[in-house]
Amino acid sequence: MNWRAVLRLAAFALLVLAIAPPQWVLLRLHRGPHARLLPRAFHRAACRIFGLRVQASGAPSQGRTVFAANHLSHLDVMVLGSLLDASFVAKDEIDGWPVLGWLTRLQQTVFVSRDPRAARAVTAALREALASGRSLVLFPEGTSSDGRDVLPFKSSAFVLFGEPGMQDVCLQPVTVELLAVAGRDSGEGFDRDLYAYHGDASLGPHLLRFLGSRGARVGVRFHPPIEVPKDFDRKALAQLVRERVVSGLAPSDPGAALAPAPAHAASCRAAPAAITAR
């Protein structure tokens, strides 16, 4: 562990000590919009500490929204959390992890089981979170990748939109792209796995290695929201959202900037989609 990693860990510990106690109190008193302000401030500060520079384009939807993004790393949570007042959807085993599980509970993460038999309970938990006024961030790939491409999206991630009361909930595709790492944006020495956490990598060593580096620059593109009709094909919807996400990736140059996108606040009615049932 080098000096940079030590300093970053110390700064992160101080950040947790500064923000976690008041957030714990807020959640005991009120779980409304005010309880979502500190997590966003926490993620912004954590990005600075970790050397994560976020380059955003487009604009997140207003109101209740399900943001569907590709997934490269556990660090994606800090990146997206610095831009969104939203709760993340995560596998339930994270809830039991030391420290990390506690921190994710403080930001009102929705924990879900991967057991197919728990599908109804998962849908109910997501509906409950949205009904409380929260927006959600989910990773429909169901795992992380190195970010060169986007894995197939699981159609089960979108069954929620067939439930009653979802008509006014936005669905917005989001592209996460690694633009630079350790001061390099392409070519020799571009170590994608310094940021990307996938395969058989271990969380602790991967995080320490990143903390000892010069950090990374990550692009986030908010695509136009998709209007989901009442009668829709779940697999077609998953494919459409994935195509939107893929369209935000640079085809060959890992250092290429994301194409510019409108900066105005997005509307759920901005992009009707042809995803009717087949």
What do these predicted regions represent?
Residues M1-Q55, W102-L106:
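A transmembrane-helix-recognition feature enriched in membrane-embedded lipid enzymes
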Residues I19-G32, R48-I49, R64-P116:
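Catalytic core of membrane glycerolipid acyltransferases/transacylases, capturing the structured
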Residues L29-G32, I94, T143-D146, E227-V228:
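Short histidine/acidic/glycine/proline-rich micro-motifs that form metal-
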Residues G58-P60, A125-A131:
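Short amphipathic alpha-helix with an adjacent loop that forms part of the alpha/beta core around
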Residues R64-A69, R134-P140, V169:
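Generic beta-sheet signal
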Residues K235, L240-R278:
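Cytosolic-facing loops and C-terminal tails of multi-pass membrane proteins
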